[in-house]
Amino acid sequence: MYIVQIASECAPVIKAGGLGDVVYGLSRELEIRGNCVELILPKYDCMRYDHVWGLHEAYLNLWVPWFGAAIHCTVYCGWVHGRVCFFIEPHSEDNFFNRGCYYGCDDDDMRFAFFSKAALEFLHQSNKRPDIIHCHDWQTGLIPVMLYEIYKYHGMDTQRVCYTIHNFKHQGIGGVKTLWATGLNREAYYFQDDKLRDDHNPFALNYMKGGIVYSNAVTTVSPNHALEAQYTDVGCGLGHTLYLHKEKFSGVLNGIDYDFWNPEIDRHIPDNYSQDDFEQKLYNKKALRERLLLQAADKPIIAYIGRLDNQKGVHLVHHAIYHALNKGAQFVLLGSATEAGINAHFRHEKQFLNSNPDVHLELGFNEELSHLIYAGADMIVVPSNYEPCGLTQMIGLKYGTVPIVRGVGGLVNTVFDRDYDQNLPPEKRNGYVFYQSDNQALESAMNRAIDLWYQSPEQFQQLAIQGMKYDYSWNNPGTEYLNIYEWIKYKW
């Protein structure tokens, strides 16, 4: 099958968040299975060119219709860790992708409307006719709209679109100007409720809504998040639209890269280990204590790795630190905050706890240290208020670090409570789950984990090993997406 992925990110060359990892990981898995996979990306001035091999001009004269005229673009081709990537560079005074950033500009709606138009125009003019076009997030939400309303009348009538939503909070809001620019000329038609009109602002267009309405299949990043998006405010106003299109909407759990996150081969940890020689994990625990100057004591280490913000349940992260200490555990935090108030709070906590030999707060992000924490900690807490998929708990499971999570989003699909899960036998359970976003619920889950560590160390080790047996690689998501591709290829 010939598949083209169109996105605003692809790790490691363009990475602002988890989207880039997903686009790369899924593309690689699909290619390993014998499919032809190509990626189309913006050519940002600030992307990591050192990760692109053999970058060269592949298409010199791409003219993209825009506001009734046309913008000249050059399309470059290169290989990103074996993946064929095309990078679109427009030559105009707008300098759409020469801003020193990926996102955050006042005209982001127009920047990515242009990118979507240019990607389709490139496929059209170069005579590329993929079986599947897979688009990601609001930045490419207009692609299925333009494919159906414009390009299907120009020889692109057999292409099918899968549209994946990674983050409902950012939906891409434009206006009449978007229609004029892209050639979607029937203003009254597109401003209907069942087309692109935003559900909050009747004078605005919603790119993500367009992607949902016009795509052949719509996915999000976990089955439980798909339900949340339809029936709760997690959909950020798109719940009704998703419900109307529920026959083509599903959740597919993301995967993690086991070539990078794997204690058996991890080059960032002093001692590699597996479920068969789990005792080697203790050497990493010792190394973690030495590096972070924690006291050598017969205590469990509880970790938190991630952003420090409201989405991640920052109030519960703070409480987890002190509750761990009160329960005779050690605590390690590796996190960063963009909000000034949260950042100042944790800097104060770091100073206050500086002399405590059972806690270390590392503010910022350190890739190498994160690997050592996963390998050295006994438990990892993920108290998110909102978690579409979640990678932290998957990585923790692979490293035999028992997750303590709040039951939201993808956390529900990956962590199964040792004591209370009624759907799985005890040998399939792998962690601890709490549901309310309050201190008492968190404490209850932490207490159960810490008590098991102290009172039944063999059972705790068995729980950790059970978690290591789960496969959260890209293998299963790859199969699910290929099934979706086959379904839309032959159904529509």
Swiss-Prot record:
Domain of life of the native organism: Bacteria
EC numbers: 2.4.1.21
Keyword Repeat: no
GO MF annotation: an example: alpha-1,4-glucan glucosyltransferase (UDP-glucose donor) activity
Entry keyword annotation includes Transferase: yes
Catalyzed reactions: [(1->4)-alpha-D-glucosyl](n) + ADP-alpha-D-glucose = [(1->4)-alpha-D-glucosyl](n+1) + ADP + H(+)
Keywords: Glycogen biosynthesis, Glycosyltransferase, Transferase
CDD domains attached to this UniProt entry: GT5_Glycogen_synthase_DULL1-like
BP-aspect Gene Ontology terms: glycogen biosynthetic process
A Pfam family reported for this protein in Swiss-Prot or TrEMBL: Glycos_transf_1
Recorded metabolic or biological pathway in which this protein acts: Glycan biosynthesis; glycogen biosynthesis
Record-listed ADP-alpha-D-glucose binding positions: K15
HAMAP family: Glycogen_synth (MF_00484)
Record-linked PANTHER family: GLYCOGEN SYNTHASE 2-RELATED, PTHR46083
Family under the similarity heading: Belongs to the glycosyltransferase 1 family. Bacterial/plant glycogen synthase subfamily.
Reported function: Synthesizes alpha-1,4-glucan chains using ADP-glucose.
Name of the protein in question: Probable glycogen synthase 2
